[in-house]
């Protein structure tokens, strides 16, 4: 199961109807029939108006390798100057010459250790993935265009500079990363897509249309070489089979258009809806869950459906996050620290189909739930370093008190296998699973 939770404030945008973009870049209206062709890496105008149908409109992509040389821009010079100043101040004051120490050693957990990262304060970690050919080689993403790389299973991390592929004076946040074998994808906001075919040794930027509805928030490498799915926070789903030269839409309209069209169905909160998804989750069958930014209802989509399907909720409790369980059921995290699990596999019909789990969250909000691939152990994380685990399918939970001293909100928990897992938080906090 793959999930992304969109952090930060999103300004809703009204989308009265879907926009279709051809290779010529003309808006035809009606459906998402979009060919997102390769474009110039340093521009956002990715469509070429003089291209003919059937022609390769993409220009040769700029690549950045592990040893690529580049010029240093103003942003990079300022960052280096700040790092030097902070380090010098630490040495002068007689403290350890470690400019960015996030409290290593304060954690006393039997399950997790905190990893020192070469990051500035304030960076929020957003996603992590390892190459399919080597579980020791992976990448970590975050705000402020953060990309870190590990070759020892996540014990140590080094900064990976991909700024040569990005527009200057634009602060990107990398939302999602996915690998299938040595082929990998990274997406971010403002709209940016990076692609590798050699396990991340070299990356290229692939152009995205400025007409893309919403911001890309989730990317999944789905199959053989060149195949991927991309989702935006407005519910647009695209898939490619030719390494992003062309994209085909899987749905015919945004979630706003669907809800405003189906307002007569009685979906609470659907009338004149102009919001976005706050959480999007995908299971191994290619089915999606999308939680509204208000937390009062959610929508689902399965391959072959033309539209997202609204799911009403009658409960007053707002949902913070939700996703799929290993058995195909649904989990919900409600505001205030509650956990609810659907009683059966598949999609529940009513709120009564959920049962509240026993957890003493102390009122701290829970932000994500993950599990080992075997499904034997569930983990949930949240505010003020809160970590809980369950060994009975999520019915009863125990608190890991060893993380109480972690001074961070923990946003994401992901396991690559039963022995390799990570928790991602704000202020550059990364916890690595070490077992009991």
Enumerate the language-model features and the residues they cover.
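A periodicity- and composition-biased signal for non-globular, repetitive helical segments
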Residues: 23, 29, 80, 85-86
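Residue-level hotspots at or immediately adjacent to binding/recognition sites across diverse folds
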Residues: 76-84, 95-436
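N-terminal secretory signal peptides and thylakoid transit peptides that target proteins
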Residues: 62-84
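Hydrophobic h-region of N-terminal signal peptides that target proteins for export
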Residues: 88-94
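N-terminal chloroplast transit peptides
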Residues: 1-66
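Intrinsically disordered, low-complexity segments enriched in Ser/Pro/Gly/Ala and basic residues
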Residues: 19-21, 68-70, 92, 196
């Amino acid at each position: 199961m793959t999930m992304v939770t969109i952090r930060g404030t999103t300004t809703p945008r009204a989308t009265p109807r879907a926009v279709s973009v051809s290779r010529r870049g003309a808006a035809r209206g009606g459906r998402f029939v979009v060919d997102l062709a390769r474009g110039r890496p340093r521009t956002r105008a990715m469509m070429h108006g003089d291209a003919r149908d059937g022609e390769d409109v993409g220009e040769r992509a700029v690549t950045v390798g592990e040893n690529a040389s580049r010029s240093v821009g103003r942003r990079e010079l300022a960052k280096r100057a700040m790092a030097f100043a902070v380090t010098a101040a630490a040495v002068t004051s007689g403290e350890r010459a470690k400019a960015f120490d996030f409290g290593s050693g304060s954690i006393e957990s039997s399950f997790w250790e905190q990893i020192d990262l070469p990051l500035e304060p304030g960076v929020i970690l957003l996603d992590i993935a390892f190459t399919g050919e080597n579980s020791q080689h992976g990448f970590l993403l975050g705000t402020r265009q953060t990309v870190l790389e590990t070759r020892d299973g996540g014990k140590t991390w080094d900064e990976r500079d991909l700024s040569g592929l990005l527009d200057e004076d634009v602060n990107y946040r990398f939302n999602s990363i996915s690998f299938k074998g040595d082929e990998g994808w990274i997406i971010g906001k403002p709209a940016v897509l990076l692609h590798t075919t050699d396990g991340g040794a070299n990356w290229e930027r692939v152009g995205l249309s400025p007409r893309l509805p919403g911001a890309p928030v989730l990317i999944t490498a789905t199959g053989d070489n060149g195949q991927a799915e991309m989702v935006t926070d407005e519910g647009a789903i695209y898939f490619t089979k030719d390494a992003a030269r062309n994209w085909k839409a899987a749905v015919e309209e945004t979630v706003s258009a669907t809800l405003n069209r189906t307002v007569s169905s009685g979906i609470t909160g659907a009338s004149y809806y102009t919001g976005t998804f706050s959480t999007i989750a995908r299971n191994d069958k290619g089915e999606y869950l999308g939680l509204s930014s208000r937390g009062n209802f959610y929508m689902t989509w399965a391959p072959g459906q033309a539209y997202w399907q609204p799911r009403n909720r009658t409960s007053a409790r707002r949902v913070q996050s939700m996703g799929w369980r290993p058995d195909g059921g649904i989990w919900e995290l409600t505001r205030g620290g509650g956990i609810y699990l659907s009683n059966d596999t598949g999609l529940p019909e009513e709120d009564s189909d959920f049962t509240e789990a026993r957890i003493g969250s102390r009122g701290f909000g829970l932000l994500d739930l993950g599990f080992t691939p075997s499904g034997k152990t569930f983990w949930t994380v949240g505010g003020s370093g809160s970590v809980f685990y369950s060994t009975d399918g999520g019915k009863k939970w125990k608190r890991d008190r060893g993380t109480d001293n972690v001074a961070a909100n923990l946003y994401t928990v992901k396991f690559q296998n039963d022995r390799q897992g990570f928790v991602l938080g704000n202020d550059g906090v990364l916890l690595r699973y070490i077992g009991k």
